């Protein structure tokens, strides 16, 4: 539905507009949350997650284009895989899927899709770390991957849960032990990884100077890398943000200010936020958290989200001169979708909203330094 509404948000010092005249994009054929995607030229690829083993493409330069299904992904259904494009091909890594015993397990396989002949190929490699909750982006001839859950710990939790069968007391005991740990004891990935398709090799690009993350917003533009929030342990996010730069001596990192709290609310960090660049401005929006979890953690409760409800968000943040501010709100809460920068807009594709409902919508947001436009 197209909406026309302009509001001057004096509290946010910005104008934001719901545009009725700009290009709109067709909805996805199915709701896709916890999936992945990449942009190759003018064509966006989105799939997996709640979309099963399907991938879909949309030609963004064609105003009349519709989503098209491509060859079925051969690695089976999976949630939270990582994808990126290098040299005109799509690469998909890892994710979370059920094994033959019905146990949810992290997988570390890798696949390549070639648009020229609509074929997939399983690659003769495995990621050196677990790739659930990881975030990926391409730079030059490599895919860079940040963060992710520990394969052994994550898989062990699900194996123990399935082994407990219908014994609720045992399952509760397993869950309590799993969540009642310090962030560092989950051993989230703390190296920046890279994969180079031309050599089929993984590389440790150096330890990140901040805690391991799952579900962080991660973007590469030019030589700059930006990391926003993410989980530091299951159920607990951080409001921290960081910036890296590719140099001759490797990636050099610095801390940015924490993401600010919306007026009248706490800032409990975000996981599953969407991000990208518009007219040179870095935008972050959506994501989910457990309001009150940071407070409980600071009070000494390691199971920081115990008794709290998950909340999805709609604030739009921008980074300008090293400072964050809120410049508007989306018409709906959103998280765990796919975002991509295209034609000075950030496209928000699929995802989930309140209660975890999968979305089919495709929204576009843009910001010129004064006005946020939502299409």
Curated annotation (Swiss-Prot):
InterPro entries the record matches: Kelch-typ_b-propeller, NANM, NanM_proteobact
Statement: the UniProt record of this protein carries the keyword Ligase: no
Active site per database record: 231 (proton acceptor)
Keyword Transport annotated: no
Compartment list: Periplasm
Any one cellular-component term (Gene Ontology): periplasmic space
GO molecular function: racemase and epimerase activity, acting on carbohydrates and derivatives
Keywords: Carbohydrate metabolism, Isomerase, Kelch repeat, Periplasm, Repeat, Signal
Record Gene3D superfamilies: Kelch-type beta propeller (2.120.10.80)
EC number, as in UniProt: 5.1.3.24
Top-level taxon of origin: Bacteria
Catalysis: reaction(s): N-acetyl-alpha-neuraminate = N-acetyl-beta-neuraminate
Ranges: Kelch repeats: 43-87, 89-140, 142-176, 177-222, 225-273, 295-344, 346-375
Span of the signal peptide: 1-22
Predominant location: periplasm
Matching PANTHER family: LD33804P
Record's subunit section: Homodimer.
Record HAMAP family: NanM
Chain's role: Converts alpha-N-acetylneuranimic acid (Neu5Ac) to the beta-anomer, accelerating the equilibrium between the alpha- and beta-anomers. Probably facilitates sialidase-negative bacteria to compete successfully for limited amounts of extracellular Neu5Ac, which is likely taken up in the beta-anomer. In addition, the rapid removal of sialic acid from solution might be advantageous to the bacterium to damp down host responses.
UniProt record similarity statement: Belongs to the NanM family.
Protein name: N-acetylneuraminate epimerase
Upper classification of the organism: Bacteria, Pseudomonadati, Pseudomonadota, Gammaproteobacteria, Pasteurellales
């Amino acid at each position: 539905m197209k909406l026309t509404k302009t509001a001057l948000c004096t509290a946010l010092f910005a104008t934001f507009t719901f545009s009725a005249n700009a290009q709109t994009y067709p909805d996805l054929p199915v709701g896709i949350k916890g999936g992945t995607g990449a942009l190759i030229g003018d064509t966006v690829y989105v799939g997996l997650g709640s979309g099963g083993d399907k991938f879909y493409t949309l030609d963004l330069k064609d105003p009349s284009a519709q989503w098209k299904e491509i060859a079925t992904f051969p690695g089976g259904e999976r949630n939270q895989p990582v994808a990126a494009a290098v040299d005109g091909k799509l690469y998909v890594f890892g994710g979370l899927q059920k094994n033959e015993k019905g146990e949810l397990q992290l997988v570390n396989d890798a696949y390549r899709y070639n648009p020229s002949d609509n074929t997939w190929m399983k690659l003769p490699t495995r990621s050196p770390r677990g790739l659930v909750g990881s975030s990926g982006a391409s730079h030059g001839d490599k895919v860079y991957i940040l963060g992710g859950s520990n394969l052994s710990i994550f898989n062990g939790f699900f194996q123990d849960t399935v082994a407990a069968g219908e014994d609720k007391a045992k399952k509760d005991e397993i869950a309590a032990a799993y969540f009642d740990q310090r962030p560092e004891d989950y051993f989230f990935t703390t190296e920046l990884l890279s994969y180079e398709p031309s050599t089929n090799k993984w590389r440790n690009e150096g330890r990140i100077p901040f805690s391991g993350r799952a579900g962080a917003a991660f973007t590469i533009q030019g030589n700059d890398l930006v990391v926003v929030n993410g989980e530091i342990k299951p159920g607990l996010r951080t409001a921290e943000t960081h910036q890296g730069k590719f140099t001759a001596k490797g990636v050099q990192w610095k801390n940015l200010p924490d993401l600010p709290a919306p007026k009248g609310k706490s800032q409990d960090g975000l996981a599953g936020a969407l991000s990208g660049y518009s007219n040179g401005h870095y935008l972050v929006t959506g994501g989910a958290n457990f309001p009150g979890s940071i407070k409980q953690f600071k009070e000494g409760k390691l199971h920081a989200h115990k008794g709290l409800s998950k909340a999805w968000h709609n604030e739009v943040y921008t980074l300008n001169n090293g400072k964050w501010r809120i410049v508007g709100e989306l018409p709906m809460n959103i998280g765990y979708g796919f975002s991509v920068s295209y034609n000075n807009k950030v496209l928000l594709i699929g995802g989930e909203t309140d209660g975890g409902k999968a979305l089919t919508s495709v929204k576009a947001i843009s910001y010129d330094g004064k006005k946020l436009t939502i299409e």
